[in-house]
Every structure is written in structure tokens, then in C-alpha cells.
Amino acid sequence: MALTKAEMAEHLFETLGMNKRVAKEMVESFFEEIRGALESGEQVKLSGFGNFDLRDKNQRPGRNPKTGEDIPISARRVVTFRPGQKLKTRVEAANTGK
């Protein structure tokens, strides 16, 4: 099961007593800030959570899996996420039942 933006807004409404509209706007604004920073080429560091980075990938040879035909995969910029140590520790603890 995936956590959605709507569920995040609902959680803000329930735990902080925010107006539902304000909670939804806050979640949207949070993700818009991340998108904007990445579009500007900036790294996004969320302390205790992890980092979103941009990585340039070179062009490389690929293959069409249906036809076996060689095709070039163009150079591109991708977003990567590196979880922070605190996040890793908490996820590992949750998965091992600690």
C-alpha cells in the first residue's frame, strides 16, 4: 500500500487540527518546493530523512526487448534519492520487529 498526498493532508488535519483545505495546500506546497528546487538543478536535503539529487546519465546502447534491435538510450538527467542514516535505521528496525 502506498502513502498518498491526500492521506498526508488527512494526517495533518487529524493530528494538528488543521483545516482540510490548508492541510492539502501545505502538502502540495511542500512537494512543489522540492520539484522547483530539482528543476533549478539544486540538491534537496531533508535532515533525518534523505537527499534528492540530480544525476546526469550518458548515452548508452540499449536493446528493444521485443525485436532485439539495438537502439541508443539518450543521455538524460535523473532524480535519485539517498535515504539518510536515521531513516535507514528506523526502516530496518521496523522490518526486524525491534
UniProtKB/Swiss-Prot annotation:
Transmembrane segments: none annotated. CDD domains: IHF_A. It comes from the Bacteria. One of its GO terms (cellular component) is cytosol. Residues 49-70 are annotated as: Disordered. Pfam families: Bac_DNA_binding. Signal peptide: none annotated. GO terms for molecular function: DNA binding; structural constituent of chromatin. Gene3D superfamilies: IHF-like DNA-binding proteins (4.10.520.10). The keyword Oxidoreductase does not apply. The keyword Metal-binding does not apply. Belongs to the bacterial histone-like protein family. This protein is one of the two subunits of integration host factor, a specific DNA-binding protein that functions in genetic recombination as well as in transcriptional and translational control. Heterodimer of an alpha and a beta chain. This is Integration host factor subunit alpha. It comes from Shewanella baltica (strain OS155 / ATCC BAA-1091).
